[in-house]
């Protein structure tokens, strides 16, 4: 998998932990994560774009974001060990790196490189969310 070299350059994981990565292909409109289910894998988007949406209690779908390559998917649920908060759907054909949480959760929790990548990813999401919210509030 030539994506491993790209991930290694980004230092998303400690060098010893790349051996746990597998790859997953998604076709356009295929679900990667379903809201309310248990998170079984952590994902790193390698190619393509995914759409993140949330179904409200009244049944309305709210678009949250689009994620591009090298974003980590499932980061919040990984940290909080909570059910999946949003649906994640392939907006186009995608390739993801996957790591099984049932096998490697503790290893990832103790990987300083991975936790740093998670922190950066969450900070980016918070920044985008804040910008989007301020635009919505200021829109006439």
Annotate each language-model stretch with its function.
Residues 1-28, 71-73, 77-79, 110:
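Cyclic nucleotide-binding regulatory module and flanking cytosolic helices
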Residues 30-92:
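Cyclic nucleotide-binding regulatory domains
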Residues 104-105:
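A generic structural signal for short hydrophobic patches within well-formed alpha-helices
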Residues 109, 113-140:
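Polybasic "coupling" helices that flank or enter modular domains
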């Amino acid at each position: 998998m030539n994506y491993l070299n790209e991930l290694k350059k980004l230092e998303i994981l400690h060098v010893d932990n790349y051996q746990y990565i597998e790859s997953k292909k998604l076709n356009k409109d295929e679900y990667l994560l379903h809201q309310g289910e248990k998170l079984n894998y952590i994902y790193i988007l390698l190619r393509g774009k995914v759409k993140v949406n949330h179904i409200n209690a009244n049944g309305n779908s709210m678009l949250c974001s689009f994620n591009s390559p090298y974003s980590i998917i499932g980061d919040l649920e990984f940290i909080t060990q909570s059910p999946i908060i949003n649906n994640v759907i392939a907006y186009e054909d995608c390739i993801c790196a996957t790591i099984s949480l049932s096998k490697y959760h503790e290893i990832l929790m103790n990987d300083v490189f991975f936790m740093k990548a998670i922190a950066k990813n969450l900070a980016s999401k918070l920044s985008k969310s804040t910008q989007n919210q301020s635009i919505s509030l200021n829109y006439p």
